[in-house]
Regions:
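Active-/binding-site microenvironments in catalytic and ligand-binding cores
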Residues: 1-115
């Protein structure tokens, strides 16, 4: 999970959606090569925007989904975990099964590993 702090701008759409901080392709590669099986973030696109590559406006999506086969979660509210200084947890997401869809709403659950 990547907490950029962007969720603090919610629900102000103008602030939340404009030029979000996030992962670069290099950051995504680092996480993928480190063994990440899914990557989530508190912004609306996981990656930083605008893109550093004028030819590809979603370089992290391209890399994670098409090249590395790693799914992403967007708009994950990590503020409560951060506020309680919970950095190690078991995470699972209960997704709605939608036939033919490329995404789904999810109920995220984080179970702390340490007190």
């Amino acid at each position: 999970m990547v907490r950029t702090g962007r969720m603090q701008a919610w629900p102000d759409a103008g602030k939340y959606m404009t030029n979000p901080p996030g992962l670069s392709r290099e950051g995504a590669e680092f996480l993928a090569k480190g063994g990440a099986i899914t990557i989530g973030a508190d912004n609306h696109c996981v990656e930083q925007a605008p893109s550093a590559d004028p030819e590809n406006w979603q370089v992290v999506h391209t890399y994670l989904l098409a090249e590395a086969g790693i799914p992403m979660m967007e708009i994950v509210n990590l503020e409560e975990l951060a506020g309680e200084k919970i950095y190690e947890y078991v995470f699972f997401g209960a997704c709605i099964k939608l036939r033919g869809a490329t995404g789904s709403p999810m109920r995220p659950v984080a179970m702390p590993l340490k007190n």
